[in-house]
Amino acid sequence: MAPKSIIGLLSLLPVTAVLALDPSCAPGGNFDLSVWSLQLPTGSAGKVDTIKSRDLQGCNGYTGPTFFTDKSNGELILTAPGNPDITGCATTSGSEHCRTELREVDPATGQNTDWAPAGTNTLTVAMKVIQADDGSHGTAIGQVFAAAASKPLAEMYYSQKGDITVGVKQGPSGNQAITKLGTVPLGTYFTYIMSYSDDVLSISINGNKTTLDTFSWGTPNCYFKSGNYNQGKTAVTSEVHIQSIAVVHDQE
């Protein structure tokens, strides 16, 4: 990845100031989706439908039943069905849950990418949750994913009570250590920053930063995921609205 690259950057303006979003466009007309592919809750078990970066981009890019523009304000809406045993939704290999989730790619090629945590690596999202699932910790809205281990190093959750937590796996085969990051009521905008920079993992909620232990992971190459990864026990559909999203890397 190029040094001092700023990827997928959109202005993080206050809610009342976000005037640039076009409600008539597909999400790709309002957000730089060149750095993302999209995993959907459709397809077959272990092989979900994936929309490539090139097909997401532009005002006439991909839109679908679970990934679309809010016609009132241009925000990106992502919905995900609940328990696949009830809803029949498709899951990725190694997962028991369904998702409408963005996965980081190389903007030059559209291929999957990862990065070293020794540099600067941040994911900043301004968003709100309209409906969280009824899983133990709620809907996963952001991940730092370890590439070689093919496991989430850190998953950030939003519960039906508005509690925001993060689960950090205690090594590639370890259980998650859960840390509470804050509380934001359903339907309320907030901004999170996931950072794995200078070999230090941290998450900020509305400016309140929590530094996290990475246990026995070492410093694996990782990539970001963001969106709506439903962890529910029932058929409850989760709904996430994204107002802005930015990925920044500096590998110098």
Predicted features, each with a name:
Residues 1-20:
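Fungal secretory targeting signals
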Residues 18-61:
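N-terminal module-boundary/linker segments of secreted carbohydrate-active enzymes
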Residues 23-30, 120-122, 215-252:
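Ligand-recognition surfaces built from glycine- and aromatic
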Residues 58-63, 67-164:
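Secretory/extracellular carbohydrate-interaction modules
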Residues 82-93, 147-153, 172-177, 211, ...:
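Short, surface-exposed beta-strand/loop "edge" segments at domain boundaries and coil↔beta transitions
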Residues 125, 188-196, 201-203:
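Short tryptophan-centered beta-strand motifs in secreted/extracellular beta-sheet-rich domains
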Residues 166-191:
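Short, aromatic/His-centered strand-loop micro-motif at the edge of beta-sheets
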Residues 204-208:
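Short strand-turn-strand beta-turns centered on an Asx-Gly dipeptide
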